Amino acid sequence: MAGAKVKTEQIHLQCTECKRKNYITTKNKQNVPEKLELKKYCPHDKKHTIHKELKVSR
């Protein structure tokens, strides 16, 4: 049997203020086609900031 295609991809979440990649997570492209934008804690800024999705380069 052929393996099923994986619909999830690994992404980085980058802080919009300090531009550092603080989090790595997975996303299902079929269920969530738009780019993620989450409010997460940035340990470098020591506050909650908006983190935007970046693709992981392989």
UniProtKB/Swiss-Prot annotation:
**Gene Ontology terms, MF aspect:** structural constituent of ribosome
InterPro entries reported for this sequence: Ribosomal_bL33, Ribosomal_bL33_CS, Ribosomal_bL33_sf, Ribosomal_zn-bd
A single Gene Ontology CC annotation of this entry is: ribonucleoprotein complex
| UniProt entry keywords in alphabetical sequence | Ribonucleoprotein, Ribosomal protein
Q: Does the keyword Ribonucleoprotein apply?
A: yes
State the superkingdom.
Bacteria
Q: Show the Pfam families listed in the entry.
A: Ribosomal_L33
Q: Which GO biological process entries does UniProt record here? A: translation
The UniProt similarity line reads: Belongs to the bacterial ribosomal protein bL33 family.
HAMAP family according to UniProt: Ribosomal_bL33 (MF_00294)
Record-given protein name: Large ribosomal subunit protein bL33
Q: Which organism is it from?
A: Brachyspira hyodysenteriae (strain ATCC 49526 / WA1)
